[in-house]
Amino acid sequence: MKKDIHPDYHMIDVKLTDGTVIQMKSTWGKEGDTLSLEIDPSSHPAWTGGSSRLMDTGGRVSKFKKKYEGLGF
């Protein structure tokens, strides 16, 4: 493997939607930075069986529903 071509791998804090903070290794940001998630396994419909309400970030869900309202979505 070539040296000095790979990004720095360091510890960051990841803040989940329920406020829980976990530490993990990542190439994102700098050592000690906090990454706040907008959606995670505790809030994503794929993992919650669809029981969680989808978050409308930037009105995209509303725009989609308005565009296709005649199709019964």
Swiss-Prot record:
The keyword RNA-binding applies. GO terms for cellular component: ribonucleoprotein complex; ribosome. It comes from the Bacteria. One of its GO terms (molecular function) is rRNA binding. GO terms for biological process: translation. Gene3D superfamilies: Ribosomal protein L31 (4.10.830.30). Keywords: Ribonucleoprotein, Ribosomal protein, RNA-binding, rRNA-binding. InterPro entries: Ribosomal_bL28/bL31-like_sf, Ribosomal_bL31, Ribosomal_bL31_sf. Part of the 50S ribosomal subunit. Binds the 23S rRNA. Belongs to the bacterial ribosomal protein bL31 family. Type A subfamily. This is Large ribosomal subunit protein bL31. It comes from Ruegeria pomeroyi (strain ATCC 700808 / DSM 15171 / DSS-3).
